[in-house]
A protein has these predicted regions:
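Polybasic/polar functional segments that serve as interface/processing modules
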Residues: 1-111
Length: 111
């Protein structure tokens, strides 16, 4: 099991051809460092694909996700901007649901 204590989403798109080293360099450029037990999420320009980089304290994990239909609800592109997500928001995001409306405990936080 990979321990994840915090989840960060980058608003600027990333080329999905990026491998582990390129994705790690992008995390460092956007977030300043790859902190242990943190997940960093990136999407392509069309928000149809997503990559997640996790530093588990010993090494780096890189996972990719693509939806069969639709696209991810990604925030607008803002230079150097990042957003912290909770577990419920991440679960909604990876399913292609509007994660901005999901709050902890299933509460609705935005109409």
């Amino acid at each position: 099991m990979i321990r994840i204590d915090s989840i960060w989403l980058a608003t600027e798109p990333m080329d999905m051809r990026a491998g582990t080293e390129t994705a790690l360099a992008r995390v460092i450029a956007v977030f300043g460092a790859a902190q242990p037990h943190c997940a960093y999420l990136f999407a392509n320009r069309r928000a149809t694909r997503m990559k997640v980089l996790v530093h588990d304290g010993f090494g780096i994990w890189l996972a990719a996700r693509r939806l069969n239909q639709g696209k991810f609800h990604w925030p607008g592109i803002r230079q150097g901007s990042e957003v912290e997500l909770d577990t419920e928001q991440l679960q909604a995001l990876v399913l292609g649901l509007p994660w901005q409306r999901a709050g902890s405990g299933g509460s609705i936080t935005l109409l």
